[in-house]
């Protein structure tokens, strides 16, 4: 007899990104332009702090929210970016994924709704649904991946609890402009909803004038939750370290969820995390910038339309001209050209694919050549 499980999870599917990578792994020599993982090693000065911590036996329970010295460092790091949060308003988390999980666990009641502008990382919907709430999708493609205020207002209901925004965006690489940020602020203030900012790519920006929501709208501090990560700027994806910041009354509730989800982040990584905050990620950013230009030129030569990314390390070209679903396109590309991309429907937007350029220059060159040859046959 099969006993019942959580019915909220019945509609959830395993990550489409991981599924594509698993399929690519079955094809020897396949070039994977799919995962959003930097191809650089973690800087040595960061890794050395873990060795030192282990040598001195730093393997015991730390404070749930992270050591005070690290939270002080995170507070100062954010202050330097124009974001005023005290050390007591910061929690070190097991990656940005856990930060998002704890945030929504603390925030949502059954039947609440969260607005998710699409395309968006599929994790948002999964966490919302797992917490017995409803994801409401706002299609941003008609606005060139910006947020149209009228369209946003049409998504708001009495059940709306929050909106989650990601800028620079995964999968488009686009950043929200001032008009989009202001639209979110007006609607959030008038509707009385939270703004959850997934800012994990904020150090990977290629244009001037980039503003984060909390920088532009500090007056909504009490309604804003900021999610950050060590993974992307410092190539620390396997470390599973992130943090979140929010006003004291909000952080107090999120801290409860964090405590019972994971207890704490890893003790012997905390000094390394503090050290990472002092490391300038610009050298990696400049490599991504060069790759970005290479990718955009290659996509243009292939005749693929794309909204130029201003940050992160993704492009999201349209494949509508080929009359294939994004899933069929990507499976066909793996089987026929040995190159892996991510279907746009994994992000809630059909007719596009995500191409990641955080791979070696050699793999990027070969992957683009294979993709070009592939689309020429369609």
Name every feature range the model reports, one short phrase each.
Residues 70-71, 100:
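Conserved helicase/translocase P-loop NTPase motor core
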Residues 60-61, 201:
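Intrinsically disordered, tyrosine-centered linear signaling motifs in cytosolic regions
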Residues 2-5, 10-11, 23-26, 31, ...:
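PLP-dependent class I/II
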Residues 65-66:
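Short beta-strand to alpha-helix junction loop
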Residues 57-59, 73-81:
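Glycine-rich loop-to-alpha-helix module at the N-terminal edge of alpha/beta enzyme cores
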């Amino acid at each position: 007899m099969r006993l019942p499980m959580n019915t909220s999870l019945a509609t959830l599917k395993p990550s489409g990104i991981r599924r594509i990578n698993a399929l690519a792994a079955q094809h020897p020599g396949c070039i994977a332009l799919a995962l959003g993982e930097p191809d650089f090693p973690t800087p040595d000065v960061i890794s050395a702090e873990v060795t030192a911590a282990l040598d001195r036996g730093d393997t015991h329970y730390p404070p749930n929210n992270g050591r005070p010295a690290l939270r002080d460092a995170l507070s100062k790091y954010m202050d330097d970016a124009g974001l005023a949060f005290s050390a007591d308003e910061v929690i070190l988390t097991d990656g940005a994924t856990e930060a998002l999980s704890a945030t929504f666990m603390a925030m949502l009641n059954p039947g609440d709704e969260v607005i998710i502008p699409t395309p968006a990382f599929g994790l948002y919907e999964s966490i919302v649904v797992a917490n017995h709430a409803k994801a409401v999708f706002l299609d941003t493609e008609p606005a060139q991946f910006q947020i149209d205020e009228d369209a946003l207002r049409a998504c708001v209901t009495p059940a709306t609890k929050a909106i989650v925004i990601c800028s620079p965006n995964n999968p488009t690489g686009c950043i929200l402009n001032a008009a989009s940020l202001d639209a979110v602020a007006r609607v959030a203030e008038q509707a009385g909803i939270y703004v959850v900012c997934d800012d994990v790519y904020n150090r990977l920006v290629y244009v001037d004038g980039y503003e984060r929501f909390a920088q532009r709208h500090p007056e909504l501090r009490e309604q804003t939750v900021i999610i950050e990560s060590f993974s992307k700027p410092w190539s620390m994806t396997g470390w599973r370290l992130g943090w979140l910041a929010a006003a004291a009354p909000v952080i107090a509730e999120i801290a409860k969820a964090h405590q019972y989800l994971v207890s704490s982040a890893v003790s012997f990584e905390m000094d390394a995390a503090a050290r990472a905050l002092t490391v300038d990620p610009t050298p990696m950013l400049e490599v991504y910038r060069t790759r970005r230009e290479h990718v955009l030129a290659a996509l243009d030569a292939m005749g693929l339309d794309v909204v130029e990314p201003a940050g992160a390390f993704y492009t999201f070209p349209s494949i509508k001209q080929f009359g294939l679903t994004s899933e069929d396109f990507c499976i066909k590309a793996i089987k026929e050209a040995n190159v892996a991309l991510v279907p746009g429907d994994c992000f809630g937007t059909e007719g596009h694919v995500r191409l990641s350029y955080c791979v070696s220059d050699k793999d990027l060159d070969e992957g683009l050549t294979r993709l070009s040859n592939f689309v020429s046959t369609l």
